Swiss-Prot record:
UniProt keyword list: Coiled coil
Any one GO biological process: receptor recycling
Pfam family of the protein (one): PH_3
SUPFAM superfamilies referenced in this protein's UniProt entry, alphabetically: PH domain-like
Organism ancestry: Eukaryota, Amoebozoa, Evosea, Eumycetozoa, Dictyostelia
Record organism: Dictyostelium discoideum (Social amoeba)
Annotated protein name in UniProt: PH domain-containing protein DDB_G0275795
Region (Disordered): 108-127, 228-325, 339-375, 405-475, 523-542, 645-675
Gene Ontology terms for molecular function: phosphatidylinositol-3,4-bisphosphate binding
Gene Ontology CC entries for this record: cytosol; early endosome; early phagosome; macropinosome; recycling endosome; trans-Golgi network
Coiled coil: 57-121, 322-412, 487-645, 678-734
Entries under InterPro entries matching the protein: Mediator_comp_sub12 (IPR051647), PDK1-typ_PH (IPR033931), PH-like_dom_sf (IPR011993), PH_domain (IPR001849)
Domain PH residue range list: 124-216
Length: 808
């Protein structure tokens, strides 16, 4: 026994350990609990197979152990399932978080790139103001005053400020370059060169810098958009060269400039060549010569021939090495652009083939190809940027070479008369303006500009003078040329000085305005501080007055509390012992009915007890009847056995009458015994029948009594319900709809009185402590709720409130 009990104790201790491990709800503890349960299973099998454990004392312990084993195994399994589900949820959440983080990183990177691209060049201001615009029609192009206003990417110009209908506009995205000239600036586009003059020198910087900022901003926007249209196969043109057609025009123009002069045609071809410098009326110097081919005598009979003054174009063998290098570079640029166009065409064809394949390929391969296509525009952008940089470097080199040529040519200038030089320079400057337009517009002109003039025109005379200017070999006066350059430089220096003075004046005015603003801010801060001081002093005065009012109220409340305490004491002394006062007449009736209800409930309990006793007696009688029936059955069986034995013995005697005469006496005795047994059997049967009748009579009597008692109980219950209903109706008529409403009203009134008393006590104690210099921010209403929860007596409230303030 001791060994089995010890095993039971060990198993229970291990089960307690398993319970504690499962409660800890950690994976290591759950694994330990599972191992312990596995080790307990064979122990439980051994205990259940042991005979000592099958005893009634140990069976209950075994059942408890079995139930606990099942419970703990179920708990361990449930905890493991919960842990697995939590791990799965955590993994899913981690995956979702990783996906969200990746998406956020992608979005942040895109937003950063966009913000960086937008923050590199802030949005330029809107340009507006009056300018003088040069006309585009007629030989003498005059300047007219116009009001310019920028709207989005277009610069509209009106007759005056406030007009609604513009004369025209300049498309700013097509702007190639902005260059300053005398008292103005030039704005070059592929279709035209706009010349503007400024009223003030400050306006010059305003317009030039504003236009340059807009150009930078527009280029940055184009780069930030990542050439979305090019990714779809619509072309990869750079911002400077918008289409292949514009560059093809430039190619045709360059090829026509390289061809020799066609003498058979009757038109006059003006093709710019690298040659002698020409001084423009705006102060700029550009290189170039004009080539003329006059028609036959049938077209112009009165015109003189140009054989004496005409200089043929230099052949390729007589060209300077600088000109050869320039032409070679131009040819290289054209060749590169042609190769680029071929690459673009090949790429477009490849893109079309890829799109056809994508329609047949699965969606995964389509996604991969889309990613590759998205990566292609960035590579194309890099290639275009590199090509643009190369072109810019080549243009800079060309400009440097032109400047060197101009310096060389200025050192050996021809000499002519001052009148011819002036007249030629004025007329030749107009011709140079017409020649500069095809140079600045090589992308949209498919053939060089053609000018047809008569012999008597001043333009033709200026051209003759210019040819004489080149052929006679006359020299310009160096001193006049130097003086003109010095005058121009002095003018520029004066303009720069004026600009600097205006800039300094603006800065001084801005600084003075800022100083005034700071002084105003200081004055405002001083006034605000004074106002705050006045407000704080007024608030302090108001608070002092409020404290005095509170003190007066506290004194009044304390007096009222003292009076209330006295009244409460009087009421407590005069309060009767009974639950309700004697003034109400209905209280006696209520009490009497309550007594009746209590007495009837007691009577019902007594009747139920009597019924239980009678039920027990009936069960006892039934048991006795069953015992009697069993005895009668046994007696009947015994009698039947005896009868069977007596009949057998009679047959045996009849067969042996002849042999044994001495057995006659025995037979007679046996017959007498059978008769007695029959009589006794009949007596028993009659007795049994009588007993059965009595049992039936008793059962009917008990059943009748039970029915009577059940009827009595039902009647009493009905009477109780009626009396309770009448009682509640009576109380509702006197007190109200609810039976507890009167008591609830009294309790509410008591709570209101207690709350007012508690608030007055709290305010008085708080003000007293404030006077002494102890401040505490405590809500008195919350303290009242706490007092009611703790069931503190109202006489102990002052001490309790002071303790709460001390704790705070």
């Amino acid at each position: 026994m001791s060994s089995v009990r010890a095993q039971f104790a060990e198993v229970q201790e291990q089960l307690n350990q398993v319970h504690s491990l499962v409660d800890s709800n950690t994976p290591s503890d759950l694994n330990k609990a599972a191992t312990i349960l596995k080790s307990l299973l064979p122990v439980y099998k051994d205990l259940s197979g042991n005979e000592e454990s099958k005893r009634p004392e140990n069976l209950e312990i075994l059942k408890e152990i079995k139930s606990r084993l099942t419970e703990e195994t179920q708990r361990v399994m449930s905890k493991k399932e919960e842990a697995k589900s939590l791990q799965i949820q955590q993994q899913q959440q981690q995956q979702q978080l990783l996906q969200q983080q990746q998406q956020q990183q992608i979005l942040e990177s895109t937003t950063r790139n966009r913000q960086a691209s937008q923050q590199e060049l802030p949005k330029p201001p809107i340009l507006s103001g009056y300018l003088k615009k040069q006309g585009d029609k007629g030989l003498v192009r005059s300047f007219k005053k116009r009001w310019f206003l920028q709207r989005d990417t277009k610069l509209f110009y009106y007759e005056k400020e406030g007009d609604s209908e513009p004369y025209g506009f300049v498309n700013l995205p097509e702007m190639i370059n902005v260059k300053t000239v005398d008292s103005g600036f030039e704005l070059a586009t592929p279709s035209r060169v706009y010349v503007f003059q400024v009223f003030k020198p400050s306006d010059l910087t305003y317009w030039t810098e504003g236009l340059k900022e807009f150009k930078k901003y527009y280029q940055s926007l184009q780069n930030s958009q990542k050439f979305g249209a090019n990714a779809n196969g619509n072309g990869n043109s750079s911002p400077n060269m918008s289409s292949s057609g514009s560059y093809s025009d430039f190619r045709k123009y360059s090829e026509s400039s390289q061809q020799p002069l066609n003498s058979s045609t009757g038109a006059i071809n003006t093709t710019p060549q690298r040659g002698t410098p020409i001084k423009d009326r705006r102060g700029t110097v550009s290189g170039g010569t004009t080539e003329y081919s006059h028609s036959s005598s049938s077209t112009a009979p009165d015109s003189p021939t140009l054989s004496s003054s005409y200089v043929p174009p230099p052949s390729s063998s007589n060209l300077n090495p600088q000109d050869e290098e320039l032409k070679r570079r131009e040819n290289e640029i054209i060749r590169k652009h042609q190769e680029k166009l071929k690459q673009q065409d090949d790429q477009q064809q490849d893109d079309k083939q890829q799109q056809q394949q994508q329609s047949q390929e699965p969606p995964q391969q389509q996604q991969q190809q889309q990613e590759q296509l998205q990566s292609q525009p960035s590579q194309q952008q890099q290639q275009q940027q590199q090509q643009q940089q190369q072109q810019q470097q080549q243009q800079q080199q060309q400009q440097q070479q032109q400047q060197q040529q101009q310096q060389q040519q200025q050192q050996q200038p021809p000499q002519t008369s001052p009148q011819n030089s002036r007249h030629g320079s004025t007329n030749y400057s107009q011709l140079q303006q017409q020649q500069q337009q095809p140079q600045q517009q090589p992308q949209q002109q498919s053939s060089p500009q053609v000018i047809i003039s008569n012999n008597n025109s001043p333009r033709f005379e200026s051209q003759q003078q210019q040819n004489n200017f080149h052929n006679n070999g006359s020299n310009i006066n160096l001193e006049s040329f130097r003086q003109s350059i010095e005058d121009e430089l002095n003018k520029k220096f004066l303009k720069e000085k004026q600009d600097l003075m205006e800039f300094e004046i603006k800065k001084r005015l801005e600084i003075e305005s800022e100083i005034k603003k700071l002084q105003l801010q200081l004055d405002q801060t001083k006034t605000d501080a004074e106002e705050k001081q006045n407000k704080s002093s007024n608030e302090l005065k108001k608070k002092k007055a409020e404290i005095e009012d509170y003190e007066a109220r506290v004194t009044i409340i304390t007096k009222r509390n003292e009076e209330m305490d006295a009244k409460i004491k009087e009421l407590e002394s005069s309060r009767p012992v009974e639950t309700f006062p004697h003034e109400f007449l209905w209280t006696e009736e209520v009490n009497s009915r309550d007594l009746l209800i209590a007495s009837q409930s007691k009577r019902i309990l007594e009747l139920e007890e009597q019924l239980k006793l009678k039920d027990n007696a009936v069960t006892v009688i039934k048991r006795e009847n069953e015992m009697l029936r069993q005895e009668t059955e046994k007696k009947d069986k015994y009698i039947n056995e005896l009868l069977e034995k007596g009949g057998g013995s009679g047959i045996h005697t009849n067969s042996n009458n002849n042999n044994n005469s001495n057995n006659n006496n025995n037979n007679s005795n046996n017959n007498s015994n059978t008769d007695k047994i029959k009589e006794s059997m009949v007596a028993h049967q009659t007795q049994n029948a009588f007993l059965l009748q009595e049992i039936q009579r008793l059962e009917t009597q008990s059943q009748f009594k039970l029915d009577i008692k059940i009827q009595q109980i039902e009647e009493l219950e009905n009477q109780l319900e009626q009396q309770l209903y009448q009682f509640h109706r009576f109380r509702e008529a006197i007190i109200g709809t609810m039976s507890n409403e009167y008591c609830v009203k009294i309790e509410k009134e008591n709570l209101d009185v207690k709350k007012e008393y508690f608030q007055s006590l709290g305010v008085s104690i708080k003000l007293h402590r404030v006077k002494e210099g102890y401040f505490a921010n405590i809500d008195i209403n919350s303290l009242f709720d706490k007092v009611i929860k703790e069931n503190v007596h109202y006489r102990n409230w002052p001490e309790w409130i002071s303790n709460q303030f001390n704790q705070a």
